UniProtKB/Swiss-Prot annotation:
InterPro entries, alphabetized: Thioredoxin, Thioredoxin-like_sf, Thioredoxin_CS, Thioredoxin_domain
PTM comment text: In the fully reduced protein, both Cys-69 and Cys-73 are nitrosylated in response to nitric oxide (NO). When two disulfide bonds are present in the protein, only Cys-73 is nitrosylated. Cys-73 can serve as donor for nitrosylation of target proteins.
Cystine bridges: 32-35
Database matches in Gene3D superfamilies: Glutaredoxin (3.40.30.10)
Role according to the record: Participates in various redox reactions through the reversible oxidation of its active center dithiol to a disulfide and catalyzes dithiol-disulfide exchange reactions. Plays a role in the reversible S-nitrosylation of cysteine residues in target proteins, and thereby contributes to the response to intracellular nitric oxide. Nitrosylates the active site Cys of CASP3 in response to nitric oxide (NO), and thereby inhibits caspase-3 activity.
Residues carrying N6-acetyllysine: 3, 39, 94
Residues of the site described as Deprotonates C-terminal active site Cys: 26
Assembly notes: Homodimer; disulfide-linked. Interacts with TXNIP through the redox-active site. Interacts with MAP3K5 and CASP3. Interacts with APEX1; the interaction stimulates the FOS/JUN AP-1 DNA-binding activity in a redox-dependent manner.
Gene that encodes the chain: Txn
Chain positions with N6-succinyllysine modification: 8, 94
UniProt-annotated site: Contributes to redox potential value, residues: 33-34
Identification of the protein by name: Thioredoxin
Organism of this sequence: Rattus norvegicus (Rat)
Amino acid sequence: MVKLIESKEAFQEALAAAGDKLVVVDFSATWCGPCKMIKPFFHSLCDKYSNVVFLEVDVDDCQDVAADCEVKCMPTFQFYKKGQKVGEFSGANKEKLEATITEFA
């Protein structure tokens, strides 16, 4: 299940709760066409990779989280391990998204 992050505190808690698991964060917006396009694929990955934590951040609802994470465009995917960012890319690239998950998971 993809967890919707609604505050800076919830984001920090989710990263901490993940422990050693890979955390994949989808920074998106409701008005973003490419975000809508990749969203079902992103959600399908959480069934395929049960050992990975999937988070979703709406940049309009959580501007502080997006600013802290230096998100400049949507969609941006960030990858965290043990609370530290280990990877990031922007764009609705399904192949790159899954390849990056398999690289870090």
